Amino acid sequence: MITNRQQSILNAIVEDYVDYGLPVGSKTVIERHQVNVSPATIRNEMKILEGMGLIEKAHASSGRSPSIKGFRYYVDQLLENTSPRTEFNNQRLNKLLADYNYNLSNALSVYANELSMSTKYTTLIMKPNQSKDLITDVHLFNTVAHLVIMVIVFESGNVEHLQLAVPEKISKNRLVQIANYIKSIFNADMRNDFSDETFMHSNDYLIVNQLIDLLNQRLNDITTDIFFGGKANLIDTLNEQNVNSIQQILQYLESNKILKLFEDDNHSGIDVKIGQEIDNGLEDISIILSDYHIDNHLKGHVAVIGPTAMRYQNVIQLLYKV
């Protein structure tokens, strides 16, 4: 446990190092943070923090920089002193959904880029698990090219479109019957209105099963959709000394290992993984994890990826609004 003054000095060193990328000396701490003690006292406290492994002495400078342990301590205190969220309704995301006619993929793609622009870091958004999103309506439409378009409406407002080639045009009445039957398969409230034998001996049996298979396949696919914003920011925020980390983190993201990071994360709010807490070879990387909600019942995941010298406070405050 460190004293309040030592915590203030550690905070000053972390925040200055993040902002300027240079080791921080005692004089800088006093001038920039109005610490009302002598430089000698600051230097003594720095030696204590260094002895605890929270800061490190630069070889060619009298200043200190945060260690990985120091970043971890700083972040833990930051999270501990941040009030938990009580509101989960994301107004910006809801507006994007409305703007893009409730196409969740388009809305999340734009949202990932917006978050990246706000944080100045790379942002990743994972689509919600829509297997928990109730299907409220299904519509089928003919097209001129012997295609049937299936429009699926979810309780969250998301809309998905699928298409199936058919040998002949299907009448509107039959399309309505098929759509209602498919809806009953995926909506427990309607299951008593139809029996499994409704289309068992019908000419439409094959089409019905193909549409159901398409929908099941789509529901399985959309649970792992990932959207990136600002991938180039990784290169901008990692300096020449971290070139190896750029390659490592890109390989990590492309391998979808981050999905396991979300799965292993037991925090209900915001969590921060630093360096090897993420994976071997990522000592210079930090990932801030959070959830986002649609209509308070559908939950997805968001991650902000950057260097260990990240503006944690700014990103955490922004993610608390997600």
From Swiss-Prot:
Belongs to the HrcA family. One of its GO terms (molecular function) is DNA binding. NCBIfam families: hrcA. It comes from the Bacteria. The gene is hrcA. PANTHER family: HEAT-INDUCIBLE TRANSCRIPTION REPRESSOR HRCA (PTHR34824:SF1). InterPro entries: GAF-like_dom_sf, HrcA, HrcA_C, WH-like_DNA-bd_sf, WH_DNA-bd_sf, WHTH_HrcA_DNA-bd, WHTH_transcript_rep_HrcA_IDD. It holds the Pfam family HrcA. One of its GO terms (biological process) is negative regulation of DNA-templated transcription. The keyword Transcription applies. Negative regulator of class I heat shock genes (grpE-dnaK-dnaJ and groELS operons). Prevents heat-shock induction of these operons. This is Heat-inducible transcription repressor HrcA. Keywords: Repressor, Stress response, Transcription, Transcription regulation. It comes from Staphylococcus carnosus (strain TM300).
